[in-house]
Design a protein with these regions (language model features):
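Hydrophobic, small-residue-rich alpha-helical packing segments that form membrane-like cores
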Residues: 2-103
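Hydrophobic helix-and-loop "lid/oligomerization" segment in the mid-to-C-terminal part
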Residues: 1-43, 63-64, 114-218
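Short alpha-helices
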Residues: 80-130, 138
Length: 218
């Protein structure tokens, strides 16, 4: 969602692909890459995965498609030969904080592309950082603090509807995210299509957001 919103705001023609984790696993896979590239895509940007996708990136390169990897998982012996690899612990980098969540790494790319500090995305960063169960220190602590402020001041309509369905009227804090919002969003991965989550978080219409929130709440 974070990078889709970023790229759309820059005028890019964007489509998203969320793999079925039961059929395709968590990381990139050759079948998905082939299907995406054959549809006419010329650039694939991964979020929270890809650092182990050496063969998949090689396939994409052979088919004329660039790949940008954003990931925070452990770097393997071989790093994919992607157009760019954005990772807080990249051996050729000197980033001072290596414990960013996957969404935090994606946020860094959004920041660079937009050339402004995209504070309007910090609600997503806060939710993703808490959900990823990374250390809430350093930048992660700042992201979560700023994101929670945004969630309380101007929550996305989908989040607002989800909280209303459960009669949660208190201020959102780390516990609200960790014990309610994040588990609800994670449960979407067990649905027939994880695209529900994308539609839910990007919903702008209250009616649509309520329908999606009810589906998630079931």
């Amino acid at each position: 969602v974070l990078l889709v919103e970023t790229l759309v705001s820059l005028g890019a023609d964007v489509s998203s692909y969320i793999p079925n984790r039961f059929e395709e696993g968590y990381g990139p896979n050759k079948d998905a890459f082939s299907k995406i590239i054959k549809s006419g895509i010329s650039l694939i940007i991964t979020v929270d995965n890809g650092i182990a996708g050496v063969d998949e990136v090689e396939l994409a390169n052979s088919l004329g498609c660039d790949v940008i990897i954003t990931d925070h998982h452990k770097i393997q012996d071989e790093i994919p030969k992607a157009y760019a690899v954005i990772h807080p612990e990249h051996p050729e980098g000197q980033y001072p904080f290596g414990k960013l969540a996957g969404v935090g790494v994606a946020f860094k790319l959004a920041h660079a592309l937009l050339e402004i500090y995209p504070d309007f995305l910090l609600d997503l960063v806060a939710i993703g950082t808490v959900a990823d169960m990374v250390s809430l220190t350093d930048e992660n602590r700042i992201f979560v603090k700023q994101g929670i402020e945004l969630l309380n001041e101007d929550p996305r309509i989908g989040i607002k509807m989800l909280l209303e369905l459960s009669n949660i009227t208190t201020n959102i804090d780390e516990q609200t995210i960790g014990f309610y919002i994040a588990p609800k969003l994670n449960s979407i991965g067990r649905m027939d299509s994880a695209k529900v989550g994308l539609s839910f978080l990007m919903a702008e219409d209250a009616y649509d957001a309520k329908i999606l929130a009810e589906k998630i709440e079931e």
